[in-house]
Design a protein with these regions (language model features):
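Beta-propeller fold recognition
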Residues: 1-266
């Protein structure tokens, strides 16, 4: 939930930006989609948009602010890039609403992990999504997170760690630095600030996970500024989907890693 300033009547002929309170949510294990609701008046909430990735029927379904449904087939040639959510998995990752600079203009966006793929389907889940909240949820950017050379089918079910100036005075930038943890045990740092190259990414840490040692990351890295004035990320590994599983090969760990470049990207 976030207060954002935007034109919530995009289909009329006037530009009418105003402050609105937006609730943006995913379907969790129930599906591969998201929805947005204007809850400025909590007694009269209104639908803004909804998106669903129907990978069974190979189509993207989109409902606009008026409730009108559009459908885009994967292979039909009708896929508009602004609706290309084909890589979206089960939407476990909580969307974070932030303001970043795109092409010189400030823009309200949502950023979230690609979701869960059951650790079996490489076609979706292994990405970070950028959604344009000023354009009815249309896709702004997909940042792919590559698979490592191991036997894990990668995805990003975890919430992202999103560091902005609202959270720490050490963030001497506009926008956000984002840290994404994936099933392969990697931490990827993504630049969504006004400094350096927008959408640039780098692997900050690799726990060398395999299906044998079980070092999956399902949960968000928790961030803090330590007494060295550097940003540290703390997280643990483990398979939250098989809590009763026992194996002598399992080698889960708890990590604390320092981003020595913070508040810069590199």
């Amino acid at each position: 939930v976030k207060d954002i300033y935007f034109d919530d009547t995009p289909n009329d002929s006037t530009n009418n930006p105003r402050w609105r309170t937006i609730l943006l949510g995913g379907l969790g294990a129930g599906g591969k989609g998201l929805y947005a609701i204007d809850i400025t008046d909590v007694n009269n909430p209104t639908h803004l948009f909804a998106i669903n990735n129907d990978n069974t029927n190979q189509s993207i379904q989109y409902w606009d602010i008026d409730g009108l449904k559009q459908e885009f087939g994967y292979a039909s040639g009708s896929m508009d890039p602004k609706y290309d959510y084909r890589k979206l998995g089960e939407t476990w990752s909580t969307p974070r609403i932030i303001r970043i600079k795109v092409s010189g203009k400030d823009k309200w966006v949502a950023v979230f992990g690609g979701g869960y793929n059951g650790a079996v389907n490489p076609n979706y889940g292994s990405a970070v999504f950028m959604m344009d909240l000023e354009d009815e949820g249309r896709l702004l950017k997909v940042i792919d997170i590559e698979d490592s050379a191991n036997n894990i089918v990668n995805s990003i079910p975890a919430d992202l760690s999103v560091i902005t100036a609202d959270g720490t005075e050490k963030a001497t930038y506009n926008g956000a630095l984002v840290y994404a943890a994936d099933l392969e045990g990697k931490i990827t740092k993504i630049n969504l600030t006004d400094q350096g190259t927008l959408y640039q990414k780098t692997t900050l840490f690799n726990s060398e996970s395999t299906s044998d040692n079980g070092r999956y990351i399902y949960k968000k890295p928790e961030a803090t500024i330590n007494n060295d004035n550097k940003l540290w990320l703390y997280f643990g590994t483990g398979n939250t989907q098989k809590l009763q599983e026992q194996s002598s090969q399992t080698q889960n760990r708890v990590y604390g890693i320092k981003d020595k470049d913070f508040p810069n990207f590199v």
